[in-house]
Design a protein with these regions (language model features):
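Alpha-helical transmembrane segments of multi-pass inner-membrane proteins
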Residues: 119-137, 161-213, 220-223
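Hydrophobic transmembrane alpha-helices and their immediate junctions
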Residues: 325-362, 543
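TM-adjacent membrane-interface loops and short helices in multi-pass inner/ER membrane proteins
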Residues: 278, 283-311, 325-328
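A membrane-periplasm/extracellular boundary helix in multi-pass inner-membrane enzymes
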Residues: 213, 233-274, 453-459
Length: 555
């Protein structure tokens, strides 16, 4: 390496080490990272969960206290926060408080910065959780369900509360990463590798996660997003202007979804209702039950005493019943205004991404509760918070709540530039993979084949599964069986029997001997072994080549 190139590389390395951030931004980063790790690892209760939430909200309170806001922003922050607290106390549900906290946190925070944090932290949490489940290191949540003509199969949640949640968690990961893609807009879409490769990687990842979750709603969420994004981006590359009719159509998707979800269950009658209810797996019937039995309240109601079988899967109904009418109207109006504002902005890759996310969110929220509950998977709340501060910025002079605190908030601190280091590492890995493509591809492929063969030969040999009845969606005619601890211990030692989440001798269990269930488990094991071992081996080879090249350069 020439001395000039070495100096340039050293300067790049030095700039990647640290950068300056204000205390206000650091407080936001701490809040957001804690929430991402907490929800990315699937925590839903317990002392760790409660402590982490308390620390995250303390960081957020500090961020708001030391920031500058105009009078309108202060009034809005106080009003919606107080309302969210009242809703929480009325319903016992933290979901609306989580949503409002993310919205109000977005002052002076760039969208790309938030998506960078989300991409790195959510991915790390997602991989850690799924790997721990694949290696059988934790409690394995699942649903046994008859799907796609295969008979009863195991739908794995891989650490999350439900297989649908797993698929949505992965799609959230895709949202974060695709927003950060830097396309080559000078090329047609089908010739732009910087765009096509990330899209293809996301497709492969989606199919892999779907192999475990068999979540049609989660898959549809991804397909709606990627179809909308590719369509909008192709039109942009072709030089097509976004017409008024197109803008209106996009803007109307959200309110139509809201109206269908909240009024549809009580307006539709007879056969029309029965058909839609069957298509949506009784979700409209549950919405109708809540509306006709409990009605709508201003601040939401506590439904914690209801059976787990009577839950609201529709996000809009969830917000209306748990958050109350006031917060429901505020968020629905804010979302509609934000979507209309977004479609009026300059057409760019990021703008198309935002629209695709909003369209996907609007449709998926009809059948899944992720948008306004405690899952922290609604990425569009970031866009909503950014929008509200943008449109309110011209109204009044920004001042701190307490003047002396603003000096603390504006104080800059030098901290490690994690994103720059990550990008630098990724570029070095890509360079090594390209430079040593044959050994990297050869070793990776060989490792993948060996891993798959080992998994297929020495993997699942079970021909029967015994699972908790509560985790199985079967017909009522299925006969429950009960086992003592001693009997279960004997069954666990039998390689032909798979015991899933046994609790005690009073817990009803079901037995399954569907051949397709165990063929599918073999296929999953083989593909997972090939994927993780192959990719891991390739990355290790790249790292080894980087170390060897670095040693040569020093000499």
């Amino acid at each position: 390496m020439s001395s000039m190139n070495r100096v340039t590389t050293e300067n790049q390395n030095e700039s990647a080490k640290k950068h300056s951030r204000t205390i206000e931004m650091i407080a936001f980063d701490a809040y957001f990272i804690i929430m991402l790790v907490l929800k990315g690892l699937g925590f839903t209760s317990g002392i760790v969960y409660q402590t982490a939430i308390a620390v995250a909200f303390l960081c957020l309170a500090c961020k708001i206290a030391i920031g500058k806001y105009n009078n309108i922003q202060k009034v809005v922050i106080l009003a919606v926060t107080i309302l969210a607290v009242f809703c929480w106390r009325s319903s016992g549900d933290l979901g609306t408080l989580f949503c409002i906290s993310l919205i109000v946190s977005m002052k002076n925070i760039g969208k790309e910065h938030v998506f960078r944090i989300g991409a790195v932290v959510w991915t790390a949490s997602f991989i850690a959780l799924t790997l721990s489940q694949l290696l059988n290191l934790g409690t394995r949540d699942f649903v046994i369900h008859s799907k796609f003509g295969l008979g009863y199969i195991i739908r794995w949640a891989l650490g999350y509360s439900h297989p649908n949640v797993l698929q949505i968690a992965y799609t959230t990961l895709v949202f974060y990463w695709m927003y950060l893609v830097h396309p080559d807009s000078s090329k047609p879409l089908h010739k732009d590798k910087k765009t096509i490769l990330p899209v293809l990687f996301s497709v492969v990842g989606t199919l892999y996660i779907f192999l475990y979750s068999f979540s049609t709603t989660g898959l549809l969420m991804y397909l709606i997003y990627i179809f909308t994004l590719v369509l909008l981006e192709k039109r942009r590359r072709d030089g097509a202007e976004r017409r008024e009719a197109e803008k209106l159509l996009i803007a109307l998707i959200f309110p139509v979804c809201v109206i269908l979800s909240t009024l549809g269950p009580v307006i539709l009658k007879g056969q029309a209702f029965d058909v839609i209810n069957q298509l949506m797996n009784t979700r409209p019937a549950l919405s109708r039950y809540y509306l006709t039995t409990y009605g709508v309240s201003l601040l939401g109601r506590d439904f914690s005493s209801l059976s787990a079988n009577i839950t609201l899967d529709c996000s809009y109904m969830y917000l209306l019943m748990h958050g109350g009418l006031l917060l429901f109207l505020i968020l629905v109006i804010a979302y509609f205004c934000m979507i209309k504002w977004t479609v009026d902005q300059k057409t760019t890759w990021k703008n198309n991404n935002e629209i695709a996310m909003l369209v996907s969110f609007s449709f998926t929220a009809i059948s899944e509760p992720f948008a306004f509950n405690t899952s922290f998977k609604n990425v569009t709340l970031i866009l909503l918070g950014y929008y509200l501060y943008q449109v309110s910025a011209p109204y009044g002079v920004e001042k701190a709540w307490i003047p002396i605190l603003s000096q603390i908030g504006e104080k800059e601190v030098s901290i490690p530039n994690t994103w720059a280091r990550f990008v630098q590492f990724k570029e070095r890995i890509c360079h090594a993979a390209k430079k040593y493509r044959f050994p990297v591809a050869g070793i990776g492929t060989a490792a993948a084949v060996i891993g798959m063969a080992a998994a297929l030969i020495g993997g699942y040999s079970a021909t029967r599964a015994i699972a908790r009845r509560i985790s199985c969606e079967t017909d009522l005619s299925s006969t429950s069986v009960y086992y003592t601890e001693k009997e279960i211990d004997a069954l666990r030692k039998d390689p032909e029997v798979l015991v899933l989440n046994y609790e005690d001798e009073d817990d009803p269990m079901l037995m399954f001997d569907n051949r397709n269930m165990f063929i599918l488990e073999k296929v999953r094991g083989g593909i997972s072994a090939a994927l993780w071992i192959g990719i891991g081996s390739s990355v290790l080879v790249c790292c080894a080549m980087i170390l060897i090249d670095s040693a040569k350069e020093k000499n």
